[in-house]
Amino acid sequence: VDGPGIRFVVFMQGCPMRCKYCHNPDTWNFTGGREKTAEEVAAEVLKYKNYFGERGGVTVSGGEPLMQIDFLIRLFTILKSKNIHTCVDTSGICFPLTGSEKYEKLLSLTDLFLLDIKHIDAAAHIGLTGQKNDAPLAFAKYLSDRKKPMWIRYVLVSGLTDDDGALMRLRAFLDTLDTVEKVEVLPYHSMGEIKYEKLNSDYCLKGTAPPARERIENAKRILGAGK
C-alpha cells in the first residue's frame, strides 16, 4: 500500500486533518518523532538502495508530508541524484488552490503520488476529517493536468464512506483525471485504536466492524479498483 516494489517509508509529523478512522494519531502534532535533516534521512535510505531493485524506492507519508514541503524538496533532490524512485503519500489538503512554485518543484522531483481521497461529498468530508475537500480535489486535477502519475486510495468504512451514491460520484470525478494508474480500496480496520488509548484520546469509531467482503467488492467494482 506504500507504492510499487520494496519501499523505504518515511513518516512525517503534523497533519491538519482529524480523520475519524486515522490509525496514526500520534503523527497529528509536530511534537512527536525525531528531528532529522534531509541529508540524514537520505543517508539512511542509501543503506538500503540495493534492496529497491527496479521498482522500489522511497515513500514519504505521515501525518501530512506536504506540511513540510521544503524538507520534501531537499530530500527528493538528493534521492533523485541517486536515481531513487520517489513517492508522496498525501491527502492533498495543504495544496494552495492558486498553485505554487514549490509544488511545481516538488512535482519535478516526484515519480508518483498516492492520493488519499477521504470523501467526494463536501459536507461528509468535513464531518469525517474536520476539513473541506476543495484542496484535495483541486490537487488531483493539478496532478492530472501536469501528467503526474497517481494512485487513488480510498478507505472504506461502513456507514461513513460506503454509500453507493457517493462512490459513484467519486468514480465520475476519477473519470475526469488522465493520470490515475490505480485505485486502491482500503477496508477499515481498528488496529490504530490502541494508539488513542495511549494518547488518552477517545476513539470515535470504537466498536465499528470492518466492512463485509461484498461491500468491499462492491466499492472496488464501482471505483474501478484492481484493474
Where are these regions (language model features)?
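A structural motif corresponding to the C-terminal lobe/cap of the Radical SAM core domain
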Residues: 181, 197-222
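Radical SAM enzyme core and accessory elements
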Residues: 225-227
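Conserved AdoMet/S-adenosylmethionine-binding subsite of the radical SAM
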Residues: 42, 46-50, 54-57, 62, ...
